[in-house]
């Protein structure tokens, strides 16, 4: 069973639909015992980092998530919350990944690309060998919606570029994974990534 952590950060229907198409059993929950008994854990979400962290603290899940031993996948703000710190609300994160979250600025534009904020659209991803990207060709395209990004660091397993800004498309540390893009909105390639997450053995 997959636990989808519900911490009041917006509509979870798209990730539920994506898991349903893969035939996966899931439970949307904020219950610690359900989360600890799950085979996989998803931390999705959209919204603002400081309020999202406050919701995790209020439920005590900020202490639970970093101690999980099963595969955990953070999506979009879920990945950002697993980093050391976010400039969005100047808030400390869960500290799983050794990255900091920064805001795109107009200075990130390049001569070839004047960026818009938020970044909305498709970007190709350069990925290292990882069970999360098994069977996905290097340079595959994924769908993004975000104004903040995680800096590249030792935990970066995939990166992309917006304007002249390189940033982490995906992070991994042990059993913890994160993706900045939305696999549930990225067509067949995103479905393959979710399938890899559901079937991987660590």
Question: Positions of the model-derived regions?
Answer:
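N-terminal beta1-alpha1 ligand-phosphate binding loop
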Residues: 2-24, 183-185
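Cysteine-nucleophile active-site neighborhood
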Residues: 47-119
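Short acidic low-complexity segments
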Residues: 1, 26-37
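Structural motif
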Residues: 42-44
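Structural signature of beta-strand start/N-cap positions in the alpha/beta core
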Residues: 25, 40, 71-73
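Short gly/ser/thr-rich secondary-structure transition/capping motifs
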Residues: 21-28, 54-57, 122-128, 160-162
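Structural alpha-helical scaffold elements that stabilize or flank donor/cofactor-binding regions
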Residues: 34-35, 64, 170
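Amide-donor transfer/coupling interface in amidating biosynthetic enzymes
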Residues: 67, 100-202
